[in-house]
Design a protein with these regions (language model features):
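Conserved C-lobe activation region of Hanks-type protein kinase-like domains
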Residues: 91-155
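Conserved C-terminal C-lobe helix
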Residues: 155-167
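Catalytic-loop of the protein kinase fold
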Residues: 39-57
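Activation segment/activation loop of eukaryotic-type protein kinase catalytic domains
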Residues: 52-95
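Terminal C-lobe "cap" of eukaryotic-type protein kinase domains
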Residues: 169-193
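Conserved structural core of kinase catalytic domains
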Residues: 1-23
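Regulatory extensions appended to serine/threonine kinase catalytic cores
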Residues: 191-209
Length: 209
C-alpha cells in the first residue's frame, strides 16, 4: 500500500505557492530526472510524464507516480496508445526516434516549468485546453519545419538552456546522460549563486519543520 502524501502533486503545489526559490525547484528537477533514469535503466518507459504525476513527499522531496501506461522493453517503433496532457506530448514528427522520446520531451516541458514558472509558449501555469493544443501544434511545426522552442530566462539559459533544448530536440537517448549534465549544470549554478541557495536551504528547512 502506498502512503498518502498530504502535499499532493507538484503541479498543484506550484500553482498555490508562488514563492518557491529557484534552488528548491532545481533540486526537484534533479530528483525527477533521477527517478526517470531509474526507470530507463530498467527498460521502462514512463509514458505519462507531467507535473500532476509527480508527488511531493512530507519532507519535500519528489517522487514519480502513475505507471498505468508505462511500457517495459518497448520495441523501437512502438506506437503509444496514450500519453500526457497535450502540452507535454512529444510531437509526431519525432516518430522513428527512440521510444524513450515521449519521456524525454515531456521531461523537457517539466524542466522548463520548474525553471520558468510557466509552461512553454504561455504566460503562466494555467493554459486552457485550447491553448494546450495550440502549443502542441507549435511544437509539431517546429519539429517538422525547424525553428526555436521556447527558451529560458537570460539568467538561467547559460546554465540550463542547452539541456532543455536537447530534451525538446530529442538529443538524449535516455535520462542517464541528461541526469549527469543537469547535476553538473546545477553545481555550476550553485557555485555562482551562493546567496540565493542559502535562502532556498532556509525555505526547505522551514517547510520540513
Amino acid at each position: 500500500m502506498l502512503p498518502l502524501l498530504q502535499n499532493g502533486d507538484l503541479y498543484s503545489y506550484l500553482i498555490s505557492h508562488t514563492n518557491i526559490p529557484i534552488a528548491t525547484r532545481l533540486t526537484w528537477a534533479v530528483e525527477i530526472v533521477q527517478g526517470l533514469a531509474h526507470l530507463h535503466a530498467r527498460d521502462v518507459i514512463w509514458t505519462d510524464p507531467h507535473l500532476c504525476n509527480v508527488l511531493l513527499t512530507d519532507d519535500y522531496h519528489v517522487v514519480l507516480c502513475d505507471f498505468g501506461m508505462s511500457i517495459y522493453n518497448a520495441p523501437y517503433y512502438y506506437k503509444f496508445a496514450g500519453g500526457p496532457p497535450a502540452i507535454y506530448l512529444c510531437p509526431l514528427g519525432y516518430y522513428g526516434e527512440s521510444p524513450r522520446r515521449v519521456d524525454i520531451f515531456g521531461l523537457g516541458v517539466i524542466l522548463f516549468v520548474l525553471l520558468s514558472e510557466r509552461l512553454p509558449f504561455h504566460k503562466d501555469l494555467k493554459p486552457s485546453v485550447h491553448k494546450q493544443f495550440e502549443v502542441l501544434q507549435e511544437h509539431h511545426r517546429i519539429c517538422l519545419n525547424g525553428g526555436s522552442f521556447d527558451t529560458l530566462s537570460p539568467s538561467l539559459h547559460p546554465y540550463f538552456g542547452e539541456i532543455v533544448a536537447k530534451c525538446f530536440n530529442i538529443k538524449y537517448q535516455s535520462a542517464d546522460v541528461l541526469l549527469t549534465e543537469l547535476q553538473a549544470a546545477f553545481s555550476k549554478w550553485w557555485e555562482d549563486n551562493i546567496e540565493v541557495n542559502n535562502f532556498s536551504t532556509l525555505y526547505l528547512s522551514a517547510r520540513r519543520d
